[in-house]
A protein has these predicted regions:
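Terminal helix-turn-helix DNA-binding modules in bacterial transcription factors
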Residues: 146-150, 169-213, 229
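Short helix-to-turn junction characteristic of helix-turn-helix DNA-binding domains
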Residues: 85, 139-143, 190-194
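Alpha-helical residues within the helix-turn-helix
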Residues: 154, 165, 169, 202-203, ...
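N-terminal regulatory/effector-sensing and dimerization cores
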Residues: 1-71
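Aromatic/histidine-rich interaction motifs
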Residues: 66-84, 93
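Short, Lys/Arg-enriched, Trp-marked, Pro/Gly-tolerant hinge/linker segments that flank
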Residues: 68, 91-156, 169-181
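Short hydrophobic/aromatic patch on the recognition helix
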Residues: 31, 163, 167, 211-212, ...
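…primarily DNA-binding HTH/wHTH and HhH modules…
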Residues: 213-229
Length: 229
């Protein structure tokens, strides 16, 4: 785990990246960018054949983006700026061709582009309550588990009503929404590792691949097949 004095953007030019903080996990498929504000302890994960680019923002620009971890769709212009700021070899050599004022302008345009983009529903919030943590651990280890919330509650000594309230109050979503987010996160990793759609659907708890495709498309914005290509 690491922590920076400046906020930073992590761009997935290829493959799937993940950014883990105390708030949860940001899932970063290709052509998305994750924002981590200054002061957040975090670590990155890479899955498949990845191309990770990192751009730090000064405090003057960081104030213009959310104060919490977030994931954004990357426009064509934002993508070109990210690649320019990091260079073809993913270092800062290309950026040396620009003076400081030009680099500042590029970063400002990048932030403007993020303002125009909507936050993506690709964050898996981390529970704080011990009971939710126990359920989360079980589902992390077995994302295909279709056990109901009531059955999971009996295993840890909590009612389904109590757990539903905790999911809503702590994580801002229902249990089924959270589990779907978790499954899509695992699906993105499996797709990045080269598995086909049917295998991924079954491995992540969908008996019917068409239902998996619909859930995946709703969250990621493209079908699993198109995402793989």
């Amino acid at each position: 785990m690491q922590c920076h004095a400046r906020g930073h953007l992590v761009y997935a030019g290829r493959g799937v990246l993940s950014v883990h903080t105390e708030r949860g996990t940001s899932i970063v498929p290709a052509n998305r960018v994750a924002w981590t504000p200054a002061g957040f302890t975090h670590c990155h994960g890479a899955h498949g054949n990845t191309d990770m680019r990192v751009v730090f923002l000064p405090a003057s620009l960081a104030r213009l983006v959310p104060g919490h971890p977030a994931v954004f769709m990357v426009s064509g212009l934002a993508r070109e700026i990210l690649l320019t700021l990091t260079g073809p070899r993913n270092d800062d050599r290309a950026a040396r061709d620009y003076d400081r004022a030009a680099l500042a302008r590029l970063r400002r345009v990048l932030v403007d582009e993020l303002h125009e983009a909507h936050e993506q529903p690709l964050r898996l919030p981390a529970p704080r309550d011990d009971r939710l943590q126990a359920i989360a651990q079980m589902l992390y280890e077995s994302p295909a588990d279709n056990t109901s919330l009531a059955e999971l509650g009996r295993a840890i000594g909590a009612s389904a009503r109590t757990l539903s309230r905790l999911f809503h109050n702590e994580l801002g979503m229902t249990f089924y929404e959270w589990r779907t987010q978790l499954r899509i996160y695992h699906a993105l990793i499996l797709l990045a590792d080269g598995h086909d759609t049917t295998h991924v659907a079954h491995a992540c708890g969908w008996a019917n691949p068409s239902h998996f495709i619909a859930a995946f498309t709703k969250l990621v914005g493209t079908t699993p097949g198109r995402h793989r290509t």
